Amino acid sequence: MSSSPTAQPSQDQLATKAQAWSALFSEPMSDLVKRYTSSVFFDKRLWQADIAGSLAHADMLAAQGIISADDHAAIRRGMATITQEIESGAFEWKLDLEDVHLNIEARLTQLVGDAGKRLHTGRSRNDQVATDVRLWLRGEIDMIADLLKELQRSLVDVAEQNVEVILPGFTHLQVAQPVSFAHHMLAYVEMFARDAERMQDVRRRTNVLPLGSAALAGTTYPLDRERVARTLGMEGVCQNSLDAVSDRDFAIEFTAAASLCMVHVSRLSEELIIWMSQNFGFIRIADRFTTGSSIMPQKKNPDVPELARGKTGRVVGHLMGLITLMKGQPLAYNKDNQEDKEPLFDTVDTLKDTLRIFAEMVGGQRDPATGRKEGGITVNPQAMEQAAQKGYATATDLADYLVKKGLPFRDAHETVAHAVKAATSHGVDLSELPLTVLQGFHPAIGKDVFDALSLRGSLNARNTLGGTAPAQVRTQLARHRARLG
């Protein structure tokens, strides 16, 4: 086969050239492919991270003598103009330019000429986008940390007001033992505290710099990657260029942490939904967080917790999607990774919105004048106590009472089961059985048994670290207040 000289591009081809990589190609990209492959209309939210990364890269290029001081100054001026244009809404995002990176670079070149073309020296979009996503996610994690704190504070606020309120504790959704309502709220504080810790762990591994890895193999330019990392406030640089540009485990790890957080929200949602129902009547949710029915005028529906429960499935689905996205990719970068952004962005948005609305729904809205919160969940102590009383919640306390009288626990367990059966047949609580009837189950039972059988006595008796006794709950409240500020 004979070879021929390289064909020169026609004027039509030059006129239709839009992509930064078009010189090799003999025809422009089809409009269908442009629409299919473009990401600019969802990844443009990375613009601040993209500009920050570019400025840090330009600073380093100038310091290393790779670009001139004049080019460096021009790049900084151009980026300042672009920032103003984006913030004001004047910036024109173009589908032809594919993504946030090329849109900004094209505008920079339009503003400052060849200096804009020199900005991309020593980098690829592969390491550029990995850097942008890490910078963006770092900032979002910091906002999520604040929102998690606010939700915990709301739960602590509610707990402080309800230390002495008795709630039936459930296992298998059946009454088990009485607990302080505050103790129950603090269980969620513990969960969200662990969620915050996980987010900080994710942040540490996210806050590492890929920039300088170029397409996959590093670069021939004498880059100072550590300088760029310091400028961007990152804790170090990725040590392997292939890994740096190709993996999205930090995004997967974040989405896993977000999924766990949403699972905790979903569990709280389930309880709020149950407690609000007429069959329980334990709490009331403020009207502004409920909706009505188009046909049933009596309805107040807990749409917010129901939606949060549903959105949890959405976030968990994003986690599965991201894991599946990565599982079959050979090293290094593949276009598949463009699909990491929409699930990641939606996970962040969903989690932030959910935490924000739950903090207000549970704890109320802070009055700027007084600093107090108003309009959170309203607790019905009478309904809670009645439910605990009806469910033989102090049966375990009677067993413990008999153990202290010398019975082996298994014998005490069996004895109390017979007592519960008798109380059930008479439609009364254990504490309402006459002493003589109780003594018929075991002669060691004395008058002091009624202290053990009272809900208040049961609560106070669990005065061990982590227990539900009011004294222990107040200790935990003080710990959380000090931690949350």
Swiss-Prot record:
Superkingdom, taxonomy of origin: Bacteria
UniProt GO BP: arginine biosynthetic process via ornithine; L-arginine biosynthetic process
Cellular component GO terms held in the UniProt record: cytosol
Pathways involved: Amino-acid biosynthesis; L-arginine biosynthesis; L-arginine from L-ornithine and carbamoyl phosphate: step 3/3
Molecular function terms, GO-annotated: argininosuccinate lyase activity
Gene3D superfamilies reported for this sequence: Fumarase/aspartase (C-terminal domain), Fumarase/aspartase (Central domain), Fumarase/aspartase (N-terminal domain)
EC number: 4.3.2.1
Family: Belongs to the lyase 1 family. Argininosuccinate lyase subfamily.
NCBIfam families referenced in this protein's UniProt entry, alphabetically: argH
Name the record gives this protein: Argininosuccinate lyase
UniProt gene name: argH
